[in-house]
Structures are given as structure tokens and as C-alpha cells.
Amino acid sequence: MKELERLTLKCVLERSAVLYAAKTCVSWVDGKPIRYNEFYEQVKEVQLFMQEEGIGKGDKVAILSENSPNWGITYFAITTLGAVAVPILPDFRNNEVHHILRHSGSKAIFISQKQFPKIEELESDLIKHRILIDDFTIIPPETTIAKLKSTISKTTRPLAKLTDSALKFTGLRSSDIKEEDIACILYTSGTTGNSKGVVLTHKNLIFDSLEVLTIQNIVEADRFVSLLPLPHTYECTLGLIMPIMQGAAIHYLKKLPTPSVLLPALQKIKPTVMLTVPLIMEKIFKNKIHPTLTANPISKAFYSFPPTRKLLHYIAGKKLYKSFGGKLHFYGIGGALLSPDVERFLRDSKFPYAIGYGLTETSPLIAGSNPTLTKYRSTGTILSKIKVRIYDADSKTGEGEIQVIGDIVMKEYYKDPERTKEVFTDDGWFKTGDLGILKNGYLYIKGRLKNVIIGASGENIYPEDIESVINQHQDVLESIVYEAEGKIVARVHLNYELIDKEHKAKRTNEKKMREFIGNLLQEIRRGVNSQVSTFSSIKRIIEQREPFVKTPTKKIKRYLYTE
């Protein structure tokens, strides 16, 4: 690999534009590919506009859009100009978006047509420049969503196409952007009370990408399919910056990745790399694979016997691998804990999965593995140039808070010195708030420090451990465990699709169905209590009829149900 002059996004892009000029950089699944040299030129075109409008080094520029090739062009245009990208998650509500724009002091916003209603009523003096990211058209002040299309076609101007001579002089010199300069501010929440703007530098992002490449190399022949939101650092660092650093191709879907959209796309792209969250594979396993393998009493009997279950998993896994295009060599899972039964299936089927661990504040990856070196229930080994310690570890179990120090750790929380101080120790270690164990170099996550329940005799009870047992039940999709009035409570969202399918044939009426579900919940409670320690036993179980509200990376927003 040709060495980077310095660890900045500008150096990354300039290097890749030369080394991989004629190769595909980004593309819609069914669209015309944008090559690396074209990507670089389009980045410069966007930069020229920003310079003409007075946007320069250090200015904040927001991005509010679904994933697309233009998202990456915009992100690199902002950061390689020396400005600061403020990516906003498309799931955020209007008031959350407004708060982020105000708090960050964003001078401009690149926004998709779909997201435009969120800023339609925002006072024009708050955001001076509004650009439609779909085609890089400038949106005039006072434009409404109703008039957006017609207004654009009549009165707006596209960003100027640069001449060859202009291209040479656009932007800053590489030396004008320092490794410690801020590249982006990522908001983990849009609400005023919980809003945290994570400040990441160019060095944070590039250093983390380089470290990940020591675990799992990416080459120019690799093909990525982008499924997770780009404003999340997991997708942005590992699904955008890292592949561009290595000359790989990134493909985007124009619609939500439902099975009818995703499966044909996977057959067309035949991706070699996918980055996902646990929920995706858990849904596939619980809704498709497990019901098929236990469809009748005979198959259930075979499935209950470990050797035949392993064989059935292997056969099902090979079919799944083929449905993913048949070329996958890295299926990365991060963002939350993976259900044990699903991981067992992936191991039995020799599916090329690997689990990683990280946070937005750490750019994100702290630990990871490649598919040949995974260990059951572990998130892999610590990145080679990062230091991790288990703080205040229990003398018996070795469990303690995971703390990190190194060049992947954020600079600060934006405009929030108090919170910044709270998450760093006096000797400079970042407090992740996660509990873990290190065994033979491998990291195992136990759960969130703030979620731990203290038992009557002082025992540490980890809700995530109990949840993993609950979630293995075939009729359960998701659950959360918490303490209420001194008792351990489980709130469970059942697999209603599977239950309805079973009872439709029996023509079960509503009264009988409610009775069945009540009995099922108690059966789940008894089954779980037989598998956990006495002090971890569930005293009360509650049906959660609606799906749990989740974050963009599909983590349950626990505070909505436990406070």
C-alpha cells in the first residue's frame, strides 16, 4: 500500500483518485458507475460552489439524506475543503434536526428531497445555503416542498461544472489540512436534553480505518453494498472511507432493503463485503431458517440432536450464502450483541461472519476479527495500536468497565466541556460505559454499566445475559430486562407472524389467542428461569405488542420502557 502523506481525508482521496482512477468508486445498484477520477472531479465541483458562497476551513456543513453516491461526494467535498461535516440521521424528527443545525452552527445543508420537509419551516437566516443533494441544485429561500420540483426546474442553478484549469486550483493544498483538524461532528441523539455532538478528527477516522485493515484487508476487487445509515460512524468509517482508501466499489440501494429489494440486488452485485447490525441476521434466522428446520415433529426431533442440528445449519447456511450472491468473504456485525442461537447457526454453517465492538466516540472500532479467527460470543481482539484496560475488574469474574486510549478516541463533545470531562479519567482514558472481560486477547462484552442490576446480596445481574436466553425462544423476536420495584421484569415482543401463521390453520378465536399468549409468556418465563441463576430469575413478564422503538443502528431505546 502506498503510504499516505498524512492521515487526512484529503490525502486519502487524492491518493485513491490516482491509484484507482478508472475503477468504480460508487454506484446505485442499477445505475451508471462513478469512477474514482469522476468522483474526485465531482468533489471538486461541490467544493468550488462552497468556496464561492464563502464556506471555508472550519465552517460546519450539514448533510441530511438517505444513502446515495452523492452523500459520499458531499462528505468528501466538505472534509477535504477543510470544513466540518455534520451528518444527520434521516430518522431524526424535525425538532431534532433543527436542534442539531442550531447547536452545530451549520452554515449550509445538503438535503434530499425526501428529507426537505424537515427544514421547510426553518427560518432562512439559520441556514443560509440549502442544496438539494439529489442533483446538487441550489434551493432558493422560502421554497416549500410543494413547489420544490417546479421551482428547481425554473429558477435554480446547478453547481457549476469546472473547467480543467479551474479543477487544478480548487480547494486547499494537502498541507493546509492537519491530522488534528475536525473532520465531522456526529450527533448520537437529536433531542436537546441528550444531544451529544461527537467531534472526530481526520486522524481519528483514518487511523481507525488503517487499524481495521490489519484485521481484515480490503482490496480493489472488493464490492460493498451499503445498508446502514451513513451518518453513523460504523457505516461512514468502515463502509465509505475505508473502501475508498483501498479502491473498492460501493453500491447503494434506492429503496429500503426489504427482501424483495435486497435479494435481487445481492444477486446482481454479488458483494464480497457487507456491514450489518445483529437484527438483520436475527430476523432471517427467526422468520425463515428456524421455522423451516423445525416445521414438523420429525424435523424438530432432528434439530434437537446437536450433530444433526449442526448438519441442518450447514445446509441452510450454504443456501443463505448463495442467496447473498455467493461471493461474500466478510459479513461484519456490529452495533449490538448478537443472539447466541444465531451466532451458533453462523458458526455451524461456516458463514463468513465476524463481530466487532466500538462506539461513535472511538471512530468507531475498538476490537474486531476476521471470519477465520472468530471466537464464540467474542467481539474479537483489540486493534493493535490501541490500548484497552478493564477498569475496576471483579476479582472473581474479571469483569469491569472497558476503557480505551489511543488515536481513535474523539476530541470532545461539541460545546459540552462538562460531559467531555465526565467520560475521561484523570489519566486520559475514555470510559466506554460498557462492561467486558479480556480472555487470551479476546474481548467479551457483558453489557452496559448503567443497565446492571444489583441483586439482594450484591450480585451483578446483567440484563443482556437474560435477554439472550429469552430471545432464543422461537416465539420471541426481542426483549428487554430491567428492575422495577425491586423485581426483575422482562418485556417481550413475540414473533406474531409465526404465531398467527400457526393459529390461522387452527382458526383460533381472539379469546383463545389471548389465553394462548398468556400461557406462552409464562412458559417463556419458566424456561428462562430454569437456565439462569436464582438471583437472575424473572419475577414478572410483560407482553410488548408493538415493536420496540429503536435507534438507527437498531438498538432498543431502553429508557422508553424502563423509566
Regions found by a protein language model. Give the residues of each.
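Structural core segment of the AMP-binding/adenylate-forming
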Residues: V12-E14, T80-A160, L172, G486
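Conserved AMP-binding/adenylate-forming core of the ANL superfamily
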Residues: E14, A22-S68, G72-F76, R93-H98, ...
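Conserved pre-ATP/AMP-binding loop-to-beta segment of ANL
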Residues: A21-A22, K154-Y187, N194, N217-R223
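Conserved AMP-binding A3 loop
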Residues: R35-N37, A183-S209
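Conserved ATP-binding/catalytic segment of the ANL
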Residues: L64, I382, K396-T397, E401-G455, ...
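Conserved AMP-binding/adenylation subdomain of ANL enzymes
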Residues: I206-R223, L230-K318, K327
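Conserved ATP-binding loop and adjacent catalytic segment of the adenylate-forming AMP-binding
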Residues: I250-L253, L338-A393, T397-G400, I408-K411, ...
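Conserved C-terminal "lid"/linker of ANL adenylate-forming enzymes
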Residues: E478, G486, E523-E563
